[in-house]
């Protein structure tokens, strides 16, 4: 970005990476930083939507609204829980795993109790707000739970869980669960994200996954172009492509581009076929560069960058077969079309 400013030239930035850590609502420090870059100079930032669409690494639960606290003669009894309205989130931990993280994100106004339950039935309680605790699982393996607080950048609250295997052993495999006991619920929505596919095995995942809001961060940032992948020969969105919308309801992905079995330059020379949204995003980054060249460099529209360029790409996107309502959680506004994106 600094070099583009020094050269007084527009710049298209491609970010073909992402992870699951954060509230996915555009409000984390990282998401805000990426969004703010939009106003630094004449640029367009393009971000891959991630490959978590069918990875079973996201789920969502809705807790019943109301006051479920237990009261005694002396008032509210914080040591007791009401199990009548409890919710369990189950997930499979595959053989051979050495590390796993799960984040639960919820509204700070909601109060609940959380227990992690092992395959053997052992229960591990969430600590007090603003603190953390580490439990021993055997073989020097540990489970850490951190009960977070809001930050200056987000009103959401995180409960962070991390499993770490001891030296020479793996984590206890089987069906684990996260038991949620509501105390005082006003909004009730809890989103849980697991480590991304690079960090966990393919057999590890939630038993009741939710494919929506599986975009990786920073594809959830506000003022960027987020790109999913579709298969060119079938004209269908790729199953792995990260789905929207964001946790705050913002439209993402913006659009989709070819991302299955794409012939591309290989490290060390030559060519190879690659699949993923990180392959789809460069198509859109190139399109963004062409739009800014047409507008800024050639003098047709010196303000064609940032959100204006994004708007042109959205309008120019073509529909995909079988999808009638746009924006769509998987395809956004449709598939990339550079020709239709250039204003006539």
Regions found by a protein language model. Name each.
Residues 1-9, 101-102, 111-113, 117-120, ...:
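Hydrolase catalytic cores
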Residues 18-23, 127-188:
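Noncatalytic accessory or regulatory domains flanking protease catalytic cores in secreted, cell-surface
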Residues 39-40, 55-110, 338-344:
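Secreted peptidase-domain scaffold signal
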Residues 84, 94-98, 104-133, 331-332:
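Acidic, Ser/Thr/Pro-rich low-complexity intrinsically disordered segments
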Residues 186-197:
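Edge beta-strands of jelly-roll/beta-sandwich modules across compartments, strongly enriched
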